[in-house]
Amino acid sequence: DAVADHDHIVAVIKGTFVNNDGSRKAGFAAPSVFGQEECMRSVLAVSEVGEDEVGYYEAHGTATELGDAIEARMLKNVYGSRPLKIGSVKSNIGHTNMAAGVANVIKTALMLENRTFVPTINHSEPADELKTPGCAITVCTKTEEWKSDSQRIAVCGAVGMGGANAMAVLGEYVEDIQRGEEEAKPYLFIYSGASKEAAKKISEDVAAYVTENDVRFDDAAYTL
Protein backbone atom coordinates (compact mmCIF):
# COMPACT_ATOMS: atom_id res chain seq x y z
CA ASP A 1 0.00 0.00 0.00
CA ALA A 2 2.82 2.42 0.87
CA VAL A 3 4.49 1.82 -2.51
CA ALA A 4 1.20 2.21 -4.37
CA ASP A 5 0.48 5.46 -2.53
CA HIS A 6 4.00 6.80 -3.25
CA ASP A 7 4.61 7.19 0.48
CA HIS A 8 8.09 7.93 1.77
CA ILE A 9 9.29 4.57 3.11
CA VAL A 10 11.98 4.86 5.80
CA ALA A 11 12.37 1.15 6.54
CA VAL A 12 10.47 -2.13 6.38
CA ILE A 13 9.20 -4.05 9.42
CA LYS A 14 10.05 -7.65 8.61
CA GLY A 15 8.67 -9.17 11.82
CA THR A 16 7.92 -8.69 15.52
CA PHE A 17 7.74 -10.92 18.58
CA VAL A 18 6.70 -10.47 22.21
CA ASN A 19 7.10 -12.88 25.12
CA ASN A 20 7.44 -12.93 28.90
CA ASP A 21 10.22 -14.30 31.09
CA GLY A 22 7.67 -15.92 33.38
CA SER A 23 9.29 -17.71 36.31
CA ARG A 24 12.72 -17.62 34.65
CA LYS A 25 13.55 -14.10 35.85
CA ALA A 26 15.37 -13.22 39.07
CA GLY A 27 12.64 -10.81 40.19
CA PHE A 28 9.66 -8.76 39.02
CA ALA A 29 11.86 -5.92 37.78
CA ALA A 30 14.79 -8.11 36.66
CA PRO A 31 15.21 -9.37 33.07
CA SER A 32 16.08 -12.92 32.02
CA VAL A 33 18.71 -14.24 29.62
CA PHE A 34 16.45 -17.15 28.71
CA GLY A 35 13.43 -14.97 27.93
CA GLN A 36 15.41 -12.47 25.86
CA GLU A 37 17.20 -15.23 23.96
CA GLU A 38 13.90 -16.94 23.20
CA CYS A 39 12.48 -13.63 21.98
CA MET A 40 15.49 -12.95 19.75
CA ARG A 41 15.50 -16.39 18.15
CA SER A 42 11.73 -16.24 17.65
CA VAL A 43 11.68 -12.80 16.02
CA LEU A 44 14.43 -13.89 13.60
CA ALA A 45 12.44 -17.02 12.77
CA VAL A 46 9.15 -15.22 12.08
CA SER A 47 11.05 -12.64 10.01
CA GLU A 48 12.85 -15.39 8.08
CA VAL A 49 16.19 -13.73 8.84
CA GLY A 50 19.40 -15.52 9.78
CA GLU A 51 21.74 -14.38 12.55
CA ASP A 52 24.47 -13.67 10.01
CA GLU A 53 22.17 -11.25 8.13
CA VAL A 54 21.77 -8.89 11.10
CA GLY A 55 24.21 -5.99 11.12
CA TYR A 56 22.94 -3.99 14.09
CA TYR A 57 21.06 -4.44 17.37
CA GLU A 58 19.41 -1.49 19.10
CA ALA A 59 19.58 -2.50 22.74
CA HIS A 60 17.20 -1.74 25.57
CA GLY A 61 20.45 -0.60 27.20
CA THR A 62 19.49 0.96 30.52
CA ALA A 63 23.16 1.11 31.58
CA THR A 64 22.46 -0.94 34.69
CA GLU A 65 24.93 -3.53 35.91
CA LEU A 66 22.36 -6.34 35.86
CA GLY A 67 20.33 -5.40 32.79
CA ASP A 68 23.25 -4.71 30.45
CA ALA A 69 25.05 -7.90 31.50
CA ILE A 70 21.96 -10.02 30.78
CA GLU A 71 21.35 -8.37 27.42
CA ALA A 72 25.02 -8.79 26.47
CA ARG A 73 24.94 -12.47 27.46
CA MET A 74 21.84 -13.00 25.33
CA LEU A 75 23.56 -11.43 22.31
CA LYS A 76 26.63 -13.58 22.79
CA ASN A 77 24.50 -16.73 23.04
CA VAL A 78 22.61 -15.94 19.82
CA TYR A 79 25.29 -14.35 17.63
CA GLY A 80 28.41 -16.06 18.95
CA SER A 81 31.45 -14.90 16.97
CA ARG A 82 29.45 -13.17 14.23
CA PRO A 83 30.20 -9.44 13.76
CA LEU A 84 27.45 -7.26 15.21
CA LYS A 85 27.20 -3.54 15.98
CA ILE A 86 25.09 -2.53 18.97
CA GLY A 87 23.96 0.74 20.52
CA SER A 88 21.29 2.41 22.64
CA VAL A 89 19.43 5.65 22.00
CA LYS A 90 19.02 6.08 25.76
CA SER A 91 22.56 7.45 25.85
CA ASN A 92 21.39 10.26 23.57
CA ILE A 93 17.90 11.14 24.79
CA GLY A 94 17.49 9.32 28.10
CA HIS A 95 14.86 6.76 29.07
CA THR A 96 11.52 7.66 27.50
CA ASN A 97 9.61 5.16 29.67
CA MET A 98 6.56 3.83 27.78
CA ALA A 99 7.94 5.26 24.52
CA ALA A 100 11.36 3.61 24.88
CA GLY A 101 10.61 0.89 22.35
CA VAL A 102 9.26 3.38 19.82
CA ALA A 103 12.38 5.53 20.23
CA ASN A 104 14.50 2.46 19.43
CA VAL A 105 12.51 1.81 16.27
CA ILE A 106 12.67 5.43 15.08
CA LYS A 107 16.43 5.63 15.57
CA THR A 108 17.07 2.30 13.87
CA ALA A 109 14.80 3.08 10.92
CA LEU A 110 16.65 6.34 10.32
CA MET A 111 19.98 4.53 10.49
CA LEU A 112 18.77 2.09 7.85
CA GLU A 113 17.47 4.87 5.63
CA ASN A 114 20.74 6.80 5.84
CA ARG A 115 22.93 3.66 5.82
CA THR A 116 24.86 5.05 8.75
CA PHE A 117 25.83 3.83 12.22
CA VAL A 118 25.47 6.55 14.85
CA PRO A 119 27.34 6.70 18.16
CA THR A 120 26.19 5.64 21.59
CA ILE A 121 27.63 8.50 23.62
CA ASN A 122 29.35 8.35 27.01
CA HIS A 123 30.34 4.73 26.44
CA SER A 124 33.76 3.83 27.81
CA GLU A 125 33.94 0.08 28.36
CA PRO A 126 31.89 -2.88 27.09
CA ALA A 127 30.25 -5.40 29.39
CA ASP A 128 32.49 -8.24 30.54
CA GLU A 129 30.40 -10.67 28.49
CA LEU A 130 31.55 -8.90 25.31
CA LYS A 131 35.25 -9.00 26.19
CA THR A 132 35.69 -12.74 25.75
CA PRO A 133 37.99 -14.06 22.98
CA GLY A 134 36.22 -14.52 19.67
CA CYS A 135 33.37 -12.16 20.47
CA ALA A 136 32.84 -9.69 17.58
CA ILE A 137 30.00 -7.69 19.14
CA THR A 138 31.01 -4.03 19.40
CA VAL A 139 29.34 -0.85 20.63
CA CYS A 140 28.98 1.97 18.07
CA THR A 141 31.00 4.90 19.39
CA LYS A 142 31.34 6.99 16.24
CA THR A 143 29.41 7.89 13.11
CA GLU A 144 30.37 5.64 10.24
CA GLU A 145 29.00 4.34 6.97
CA TRP A 146 26.96 1.15 7.22
CA LYS A 147 28.63 -0.92 4.52
CA SER A 148 26.85 -4.02 3.25
CA ASP A 149 26.71 -6.11 0.08
CA SER A 150 23.10 -7.07 0.78
CA GLN A 151 19.98 -5.61 2.40
CA ARG A 152 20.82 -3.93 5.70
CA ILE A 153 18.94 -5.53 8.60
CA ALA A 154 18.66 -4.57 12.26
CA VAL A 155 16.88 -5.81 15.38
CA CYS A 156 15.32 -3.51 17.99
CA GLY A 157 14.91 -4.78 21.54
CA ALA A 158 12.86 -3.50 24.47
CA VAL A 159 12.18 -4.83 27.96
CA GLY A 160 9.16 -4.08 30.14
CA MET A 161 8.40 -4.35 33.83
CA GLY A 162 7.25 -7.81 34.87
CA GLY A 163 9.35 -9.76 32.37
CA ALA A 164 7.99 -8.54 29.03
CA ASN A 165 10.35 -8.70 26.05
CA ALA A 166 9.57 -7.16 22.66
CA MET A 167 11.70 -7.24 19.53
CA ALA A 168 11.29 -6.10 15.93
CA VAL A 169 13.35 -6.86 12.84
CA LEU A 170 13.71 -3.89 10.50
CA GLY A 171 15.06 -4.02 6.99
CA GLU A 172 16.40 -1.40 4.65
CA TYR A 173 13.85 -0.40 2.01
CA VAL A 174 15.21 -1.27 -1.41
CA GLU A 175 13.22 0.46 -4.11
CA ASP A 176 12.16 -1.59 -7.11
CA ILE A 177 13.56 0.41 -10.00
CA GLN A 178 11.77 -1.69 -12.61
CA ARG A 179 9.00 0.61 -13.81
CA GLY A 180 6.62 0.69 -16.72
CA GLU A 181 6.59 3.23 -19.48
CA GLU A 182 5.45 6.73 -18.65
CA GLU A 183 1.79 7.17 -19.51
CA ALA A 184 1.24 9.63 -22.34
CA LYS A 185 -1.15 12.12 -20.76
CA PRO A 186 -1.12 15.69 -19.40
CA TYR A 187 0.53 16.16 -15.98
CA LEU A 188 -0.18 19.07 -13.65
CA PHE A 189 2.88 21.02 -12.45
CA ILE A 190 2.06 23.10 -9.37
CA TYR A 191 4.29 25.98 -8.29
CA SER A 192 3.93 29.41 -6.74
CA GLY A 193 5.76 32.69 -6.45
CA ALA A 194 5.69 35.79 -4.28
CA SER A 195 4.72 37.82 -7.35
CA LYS A 196 3.59 37.27 -10.94
CA GLU A 197 7.14 37.89 -12.08
CA ALA A 198 8.52 35.32 -9.64
CA ALA A 199 5.93 32.73 -10.68
CA LYS A 200 6.73 33.35 -14.36
CA LYS A 201 10.46 32.90 -13.66
CA ILE A 202 9.84 29.59 -11.87
CA SER A 203 7.68 28.43 -14.78
CA GLU A 204 10.44 29.25 -17.24
CA ASP A 205 13.09 27.53 -15.09
CA VAL A 206 11.01 24.35 -14.81
CA ALA A 207 10.33 24.33 -18.54
CA ALA A 208 14.02 24.76 -19.29
CA TYR A 209 15.04 22.00 -16.88
CA VAL A 210 12.64 19.36 -18.22
CA THR A 211 13.62 20.28 -21.77
CA GLU A 212 17.36 19.96 -21.17
CA ASN A 213 17.27 16.86 -18.93
CA ASP A 214 15.90 13.34 -19.10
CA VAL A 215 12.92 13.84 -16.79
CA ARG A 216 9.87 11.67 -16.26
CA PHE A 217 6.88 14.01 -16.14
CA ASP A 218 4.98 11.73 -13.74
CA ASP A 219 7.86 11.94 -11.24
CA ALA A 220 8.19 15.70 -11.64
CA ALA A 221 4.45 16.27 -11.23
CA TYR A 222 4.42 14.14 -8.07
CA THR A 223 7.29 15.98 -6.37
CA LEU A 224 6.48 19.56 -7.36
List the model feature ranges, each with a label:
Residues 192:
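Short hydrophobic/aromatic beta-strand micro-patches
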Residues 1-183, 188, 197, 212, ...:
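Condensing-enzyme catalytic core of the thiolase-fold
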Residues 204-224:
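Short, low-complexity connector segments at domain boundaries
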Residues 199-202:
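Hydrophobic side chains in well-ordered alpha-helices
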